[in-house]
């Protein structure tokens, strides 16, 4: 496991973040896209208006957890390369400056479900349960008519 300080450029959605990564000694990787490993959040860029409400809530929660600075934990393959997902994004997990893993927080609060690959249909039941939980807690309000 490797640990890097990074500057958050943009939270794309609840499980994807654009960052500049500080490799140390003044060396930076700029504009890297990181996929948070082990979770799936509702999509924030979708034609499903209800899902979008929950996706934007997950995105906002991740923004509040990360702020401008975060710690990125990544794994390196046997070839010495950062692990990458199917869309070429670095796979890793972010920690807040207080040391908390963002993935764990998002799961515990109902903004994300555990996901280790495979069909996203397998996670639908848990996503729907999370939706109801977030509504019941008053964390997310779905506008009437959606």
Residue ranges and their predicted role:
Residues 1-146:
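Small beta-barrel nucleic-acid-binding modules, primarily SNase/OB-fold domains
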């Amino acid at each position: 496991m490797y640990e890097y300080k990074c500057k958050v450029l943009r939270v794309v959605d609840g499980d994807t973040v654009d960052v500049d990564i500080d490799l140390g000694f003044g060396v930076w990787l700029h504009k890297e896209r990181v996929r948070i490993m082990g979770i799936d959040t509702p999509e924030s860029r979708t034609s499903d208006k209800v899902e979008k409400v929950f996706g934007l809530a997950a995105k906002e929660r991740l923004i509040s957890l990360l702020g401008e600075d975060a710690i990125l934990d990544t794994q390196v393959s046997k070839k010495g390369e950062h692990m990458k997902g199917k869309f070429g994004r670095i796979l890793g997990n972010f920690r807040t400056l207080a040391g908390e893993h963002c993935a764990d927080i998002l799961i515990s609060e109902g903004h994300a479900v555990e996901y280790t690959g495979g069909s996203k249909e397998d996670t639908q039941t848990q996503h729907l349960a999370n939706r109801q939980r977030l509504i019941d807690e008053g964390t997310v309000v779905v506008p009437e008519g959606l």
